[in-house]
C-alpha cells in the first residue's frame, strides 16, 4: 500500500514538473514572428503607398520586409491585411492570449489615432505601438499606422485609412528583464492606451504601464529619457523618449547630437508644415524628399507617413532609428520616441531607399 502511494506521488510530482516546464517553455514562445509563423529576434517592414498609376495594380497593402534571419529587403507575397502577413502572424499571439484570459500574459495597445475615433486628442503622445509579454519574454511593436490594430475582440485587420500613404514599423523580441526599462520609456511617451490587460503579477516590477492602462498615472514625467535595450538574442538598441515638455525637434536638438552623426530623416511632410533641413548644430539633419524602390520606381515623401532616419552615407556612426514623430513645428509639443540600432542589415536596407534629400539653405 505504501509503495503504491509513493509511486502515485512520484507520478504526480513528475506530471506537475512536466506541466511546469511546459508552461515555462510555452510562455517563452511570445516573440516577433515571420510570415511562416516562426519566431525571429526582430523584423522591420515598410508598407508601400497606394500610387495613382492604375496600371501598376498596387492596392496600398504591399510591403517590404526584413528580419534577423535575412540580409536585405524583399517584397512580401502577402498583403498587409492578410492574417498570414508579418503583422497578422505576430498579432495572432495577442488574440490567443486574449481568448485564454491568462493571468500570466499581459498586453498594452496604444495609438494617438485610435480605431473608430470619436475625437482626436492631443493630450497624449504622438505614438503608436503594441506590447505583449509574459514573465519570460515578449515583443514590442512600434509603428506609424493610425487606427491600428483593432481591439483584440475584433481580430486582425488593417485599416482602409492606412492604405494611401507609406507606413513603417519595427518589432523587437525582448526578455522580461528589459520590460522595467521599457515601462519608464512609455511613461515619458505618454501613449493613448485603448486596450490593455496587465495582471497584478506584473505590478511590482512594472509601475507605470498599469497606471497608463487605467489612465491613472500620477508619476512625475521627465522631459526626456534615453535607455539602452537588448533584444532576446543580444542586439543592442537605444530608445529616445521625449515628453511634451521637451519643446524642440527631437532629431536636430537631441538624436543627431547624442548619436554624433548627421541624420537623413523620412517623416510625413505636409506642405508648408515641415521643418527645413537644419545645419545650425554640430550634427546636421536633412529631410529626405523621395524614396526609391528600383531604378525606375520611386515615391515622394509627401506620400509617406513612415517615420525613420539614418546616418548620412559615409559617416562613421551608422545608425537607423524608427519611431513616432514627424519633423514639423507642432510635433515639438508632442511626446513620442524613436528606437535606434547600429545593425548593419537594417542600415543598408534603409540607406538603399534614399533617392535624394534636401540640403540646408
From Swiss-Prot:
Entry annotated with the keyword Signal: yes
EC number: 3.1.22.1
Pfam assignment, any one: DNase_II
Record keyword Transport present: no
Domain of life: Eukaryota
Family: Belongs to the DNase II family.
Protein name: Deoxyribonuclease-2-beta
Organism: Homo sapiens
Amino acid at each position: 500500500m505504501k509503495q503504491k502511494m509513493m509511486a502515485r506521488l512520484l507520478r504526480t510530482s513528475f506530471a506537475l514538473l512536466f506541466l511546469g516546464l511546459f508552461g515555462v517553455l510555452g510562455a517563452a514562445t511570445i516573440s516577433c514572428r515571420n510570415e511562416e509563423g516562426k519566431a525571429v529576434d526582430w523584423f522591420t517592414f515598410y508598407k508601400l503607398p497606394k500610387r495613382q498609376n492604375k496600371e501598376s495594380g498596387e492596392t496600398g497593402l504591399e510591403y517590404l520586409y526584413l528580419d534577423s534571419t535575412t540580409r536585405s529587403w524583399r517584397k512580401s507575397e502577402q498583403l498587409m491585411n492578410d492574417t498570414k502577413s508579418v503583422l497578422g502572424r505576430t498579432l495572432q499571439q495577442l488574440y490567443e492570449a486574449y481568448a485564454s484570459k491568462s493571468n500570466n500574459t499581459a498586453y498594452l495597445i496604444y495609438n494617438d489615432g485610435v480605431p473608430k475615433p470619436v475625437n482626436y486628442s492631443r493630450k497624449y503622445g504622438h505614438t503608436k505601438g503594441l506590447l505583449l509579454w509574459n514573465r519570460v519574454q515578449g515583443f514590442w511593436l512600434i509603428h506609424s499606422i493610425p487606427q491600428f490594430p483593432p481591439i483584440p475582440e475584433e481580430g486582425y485587420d488593417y485599416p482602409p485609412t492606412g492604405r494611401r500613404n507609406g507606413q513603417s514599423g519595427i518589432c523587437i523580441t525582448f526578455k522580461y528583464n528589459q520590460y522595467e526599462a521599457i515601462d519608464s520609456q512609455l511613461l515619458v511617451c505618454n501613449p493613448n492606451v485603448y486596450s490593455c490587460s496587465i495582471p497584478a503579477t506584473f505590478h511590482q516590477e512594472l509601475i507605470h504601464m498599469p497606471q497608463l492602462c487605467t489612465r491613472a498615472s500620477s508619476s512625475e514625467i521627465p522631459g526626456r529619457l534615453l535607455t539602452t535595450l537588448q533584444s532576446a538574442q543580444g542586439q543592442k538598441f537605444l530608445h529616445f523618449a521625449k515628453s511634451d515638455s521637451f519643446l524642440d525637434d527631437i532629431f536636430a536638438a537631441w538624436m543627431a547630437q547624442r548619436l554624433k552623426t548627421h541624420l537623413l530623416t523620412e517623416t510625413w511632410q505636409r506642405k508648408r508644415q515641415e521643418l527645413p533641413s537644419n545645419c545650425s548644430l554640430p550634427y546636421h539633419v536633412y529631410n529626405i524628399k523621395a524614396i526609391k524602390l528600383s531604378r525606375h520606381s520611386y515615391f515622394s515623401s509627401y506620400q509617406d507617413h513612415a517615420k525613420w532616419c539614418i546616418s548620412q552615407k559615409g559617416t562613421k556612426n551608422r545608425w537607423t532609428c524608427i519611431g513616432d514623430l514627424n519633423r514639423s513645428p507642432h510635433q515639438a509639443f508632442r511626446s513620442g520616441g524613436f528606437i535606434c540600432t547600429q545593425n548593419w542589415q537594417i542600415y543598408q536596407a534603409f540607406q538603399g531607399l534614399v533617392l535624394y534629400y534636401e540640403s540646408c539653405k
